[in-house]
Regions:
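Intrinsically disordered, low-complexity regions enriched in Ser/Pro/Gly/Gln/His and often acidic
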Residues: 1-2, 38-40, 56
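Short alpha-helical segments that sit at the start of domains
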Residues: 1-14, 62-63, 68
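Short amphipathic alpha-helical interface segments
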Residues: 6-34
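Short amphipathic alpha-helical segments enriched in leucine
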Residues: 18, 46-49
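Long, charged, low-complexity, helical-prone intrinsically disordered regions
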Residues: 25, 34, 55, 63-68
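Short loop/turn and capping residues at structural boundaries
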Residues: 28, 42, 59-60
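Short amphipathic alpha-helical interaction segments
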Residues: 36-47
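A short, conserved structural fragment
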Residues: 49-59
């Protein structure tokens, strides 16, 4: 895992969210849409969160990721 890889994964996550009408997905759906491993997805979310591009909320069953 390196900075370039994390940036690439963050781009994949951003595109997956951007392609949704609601601009949000649950973690399970996001993992399926990007085909990233759990640690790759978490690193990408950390990257996007640090840049202020996403917001995370919880519902009863899943963590919801949404573009700002």
């Amino acid at each position: 895992m390196n900075i370039e890889s994390i940036g690439t994964w963050a781009g994949e996550v951003y595109k997956a969210l951007e392609n949704q009408d609601t601009r949000m997905l649950g973690m399970k759906a996001l993992k399926k849409a990007t085909k990233l491993k759990k640690d790759e997805l978490m690193a990408a979310l950390g990257w996007l969160g640090r840049e202020g591009k996403i917001v995370l909320t919880e519902d009863d069953e899943d963590l919801i990721v949404a573009l700002v």
